[in-house]
UniProtKB/Swiss-Prot annotation:
Signal peptide residue numbers: 1-24
A Pfam family hit: Endothelin
GO molecular function, one term: endothelin B receptor binding
Gene: EDN2
Propeptide residue intervals: 25-46, 70-178
Sequence ranges of Basic residues compositional bias: 169-178
Region (Endothelin-like) residue spans: 96-111
Species the sequence originates in: Canis lupus familiaris (Dog)
Subcellular compartments: Secreted
Name of the protein in question: Endothelin-2
Intrachain S-S bonds: C49-C63, C51-C59
Key words of the record: Cleavage on pair of basic residues, Disulfide bond, Secreted, Signal, Vasoactive, Vasoconstrictor
Site (Cleavage): W69, V70
Summary of the function given for this chain in its UniProt record: Endothelins are endothelium-derived vasoconstrictor peptides.
Length: 178
């Protein structure tokens, strides 16, 4: 019997014999092909578009179809989202990009201007006509002039019929204290 730690050249473990026997052979193909690294690492979720910002909750809710929204004390948190590569997220100039070019609802949502960018000007046209015409005020002077016109129009008209007939009280009391 050999001393402990010393191996006899003719004795090898069954594992080493198996590895040595299969060294020059090609392994048989398994019945089911191995899943790709991408399929193993992540769950592909159905989505109609990719948002350029995860902070845009309306976009995330619209684009990602299988998100579970959970109400938390400070905010509504989407669960089921992974972190997309930051480079792709920053490179998108629009609100989102549609997965399918044939989805008109997605195209309308992703490529429309936000309501905050639209400036409605009082005049003969309705606000809907002004918005659809795509008019924006590019110069600060033009915007300031329009805001002054709105302010002047509000001053000319009384706010409510009741307020127009009511007299205002003086700010000081009528009787003097002795």
């Amino acid at each position: 019997m050999p001393a402990p730690g010393v191996h006899h050249p003719n004795t090898a473990s069954p594992f080493l014999k198996t590895v040595a026997a299969g060294k020059g052979q090609v392994a048989a193909a398994p019945e089911h092909p191995a899943p790709s690294a991408r399929a193993r690492g992540s769950h592909l979720r159905p989505r109609r578009c990719s948002c350029s910002s995860w902070l845009d909750k309306e976009c995330v809710y619209f684009c990602h179809l299988d998100i579970i929204w959970v109400n938390t004390p400070g905010q509504t948190a989407p669960y089921g989202l992974g972190n997309p590569p930051r480079r792709r997220r920053r490179s998108l100039p629009k609100r989102c990009e549609c997965s399918s070019g044939g989805d008109p609802a997605c195209a309308t949502f992703c490529h429309r201007r936000p309501w905050a960018e639209a400036v409605v000007v009082p005049g003969s046209r309705s606000p809907a006509d002004v918005f659809q015409a795509g008019r924006t005020w590019t110069s600060a002077g033009e915007l300031l002039r329009q805001l002054r016109n709105i302010s002047a129009a509000k001053i000319r008209f009384p706010r409510r019929p009741q307020e127009a007939g009511r007299q205002l009280r003086p700010t000081h009391p009528r009787r003097r204290k002795r």
